[in-house]
UniProtKB/Swiss-Prot annotation:
GO terms for biological process: CTP biosynthetic process; GTP biosynthetic process; UTP biosynthetic process. Transmembrane segments: none annotated. It is found in: Cytoplasm. CDD domains: NDPk_I. Its cofactor is Mg(2+). It holds the Pfam family NDK. One of its GO terms (molecular function) is metal ion binding. This is Nucleoside diphosphate kinase. Its EC number is 2.7.4.6. It comes from Acidovorax ebreus (strain TPSY) (Diaphorobacter sp. (strain TPSY)).
């Protein structure tokens, strides 16, 4: 099994609910290490750049508006099969379809306010981690 890194964002809805610690506990219980983390309030330009892959999709404006509506907690996670493991922890994008016990089933309100973002592939993860943590701001342990 390969040690990977993935990006996780705890979105404004979950930050506002004060469940960062509960979500972090789930990462750690699953064997994922938090190797970089910071709280930020994204600017419109940053959110548009980060989600540029969705620019032509009908939900793009709503996604950007939501992501700049409050602070987010951004973290790089490291562990065996980190991308897949994080996606399993998150659950389905629509919390109504998310399996019980997943982050979205437990903390998300809607398909838009769905608590967390996670990289969808190892290649995407590299780009996303570098977007928020350029240079040597990651500390493997």
């Amino acid at each position: 099994m390969a040690i990977e890194r993935t990006l996780s964002i705890i979105k404004p809805d979950a930050v506002a609910k004060n469940v960062i610690g509960q979500i972090y506990a789930r990462f750690e219980a699953a064997g994922l290490k938090i190797v970089a983390a910071r709280m930020i309030h994204l600017s419109r330009a940053e959110a548009e750049q980060f989600y540029a892959v969705h620019k032509e999709r009908p939900f793009f404006k709503d996604l950007v508006d939501f992501m700049i509506s409050g602070p987010v907690m951004v973290q790089a996670l490291e562990g065996e099969n980190a991308v897949l493991k994080n996606r399993e922890l998150m659950g389905a994008t629509d919390p109504k379809k998310a399996a019980p016990g997943t982050i979205r089933a437990d903390f998300a309100d809607s398909i838009d306010a769905n608590a967390v973002h996670g990289s969808d592939a190892a290649e995407t993860a590299q780009v996303e981690v570098a977007f928020f943590f350029p240079g040597l701001n990651i500390y493997s342990r």
